[in-house]
A protein has these predicted regions:
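Short coil turns that delineate tetratricopeptide repeat
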Residues: 50, 91, 125, 158-159, ...
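Canonical tetratricopeptide repeat
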Residues: 58, 99, 133, 166-167, ...
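Residue-level detector of the short coil/turn that links helix A to helix B
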Residues: 74, 108, 142, 175, ...
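N-terminal leader/linker segments that initiate helical-solenoid repeat arrays
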Residues: 7-95, 379-382
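Canonical positions in the second alpha-helix
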Residues: 45, 85-86, 119-120, 153-154, ...
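Residue at a conserved register position within TPR or TPR-like alpha-solenoid repeats
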Residues: 63, 70, 104, 138, ...
């Protein structure tokens, strides 16, 4: 979410090179040349004027964008390295703190990200991006009361669209699912809004529709969201998960066949290939397994949800999947995290974990049609 990271790597002895089982395996993804070339003028400008904050912010934002769209944490590290001279100051600029927090969020360092956001808000109390990022982090961790308070602060900026979408998303996970879904649907989507904002609203509607048991509308909203932001890896993963659950793996292969470079999407390809009998299924599974081992070697534990899914759906190892899913649940609590945890607990026959899930749902008033299925149906259900 890294000059510090890069500096640490440079100051230690290099590890022995790790060789994949398949010499043809692609372990790293190099983003399209056009993406990197787009940032070349900013890199040159920052080298010429290292004290230019606006250039540093633009370059770090570009790195974060590339890293997010390509699921490539190296570019998040580049963003952190670009921001480090600014956030290390005794009085760091507020915008640098917010961007560094966004980078930390990507790396799942949520506590550190919240600390930076609190510092940024202390400097600029009405910064909408800081409050929205804070709300997103708190919602992701399942801290719905504090997330709602952060959403409400957006109203002070007269940012009605962001506030409404933010509040609907949080309220929809804390006891007001039907009302929040209706309110967000009736709010309409202004076509003049930037595509990422339209996609955010549509993605939130898709999540609510699925938890209400309306798969038809969930799919329609996801398709519309992808139309607004077709390269968003999170939306593509969500749509793939829906198609897998509905027993349509061939469509997942068609959707993601050119997405091997992005680990979360490669996982969905491996699952879909296995289900559909695709000739590439074994290669996709092996490639994902090698990516997992490479991530473990590098100390990267930011995709534990996907690791649990892999252990459950490809390796058919519910006990190992449950261990990873429970560890992931202690860090982040999105609907997809809960479903993977619940499915692993059911498959591993763990009453303790199922009871813990039930207690959390009761305490937060969380609603999900898929989780209301009886245990036997949960076990038989396709990936969450």
């Amino acid at each position: 979410m890294a000059a510090a990271v890069l500096g640490f790597a440079a100051s230690t002895a290099p590890a022995l090179p790790w060789q994949p089982a398949d010499d043809a395996a692609v372990l790293e993804h190099v983003p399209a040349r056009s993406e990197l070339e787009r940032l070349a003028p900013l890199r040159a400008a920052l080298m010429a004027h290292p004290q230019d904050l606006q250039v540093a912010l633009a370059l770090s934002s570009g790195y974060i964008d590339i890293g997010r769209r390509n699921s490539d944490p190296r570019f998040i590290a580049y963003a952190q390295a670009t921001l480090l001279p600014w956030v290390s100051r005794a009085s760091p600029p507020e915008r640098a703190l917010v961007l560094q927090a966004i980078a930390l969020q990507y790396l799942h360092r949520f506590g550190a990200a919240l600390t930076l956001l609190d510092r940024a808000i202390a400097l600029v109390p009405l910064d909408g991006q800081a409050w929205l990022t804070r709300a997103s982090l708190l919602e992701l961790r399942g801290d719905y009361p504090d997330a709602r308070r952060a959403c409400a602060r957006l109203m002070l900026r007269a940012d009605e669209f962001a506030a409404l979408t933010c509040l609907a998303s949080v309220d929809g996970r804390s006891g007001r699912l039907t009302e929040s879904y209706s309110a967000l649907r009736n709010s309409g989507g202004d076509p003049r809004l930037p595509a990422p904002l339209r996609a955010w609203r549509l993605g939130a509607l898709a999540d609510m529709a699925e938890r209400l048991g309306d798969d038809r509308m969930a799919e329609a909203y996801l398709k519309a969201a992808l139309h607004a932001s077709r390269d968003d890896p999170y939306l593509r993963a969500a749509y793939a998960d829906l198609l897998l659950r509905l027993g349509r793996p061939v469509e997942v292969v068609a959707l993601l066949k050119d997405s091997e470079a992005q680990d979360p999407l490669l996982l969905r390809l491996a699952i879909a290939g296995r289900r559909s009998g695709n000739a590439q299924a074994g290669r996709w599974s092996q490639l994902y397994d090698e990516r997992l081992r490479a991530a473990a070697r590098d100390g990267d534990s930011s995709h534990q949800r996907e690791q649990a899914m892999y252990l459950l759906e490809v390796r058919d190892d519910p006990r190992a999947a449950l261990e990873v899913a429970a560890r992931n649940w202690s860090v982040q609590r999105e609907p997809a995290d809960l479903r993977v945890y619940a499915r692993a607990a059911a498959r591993a026959n763990s009453p303790h974990d199922l009871a813990a899930i039930a207690r959390w749902c009761a305490a937060t008033h969380y609603e999900d049609h898929l989780l209301s299925l009886p245990p036997a149906a949960r076990v038989a259900e396709r990936p969450l």
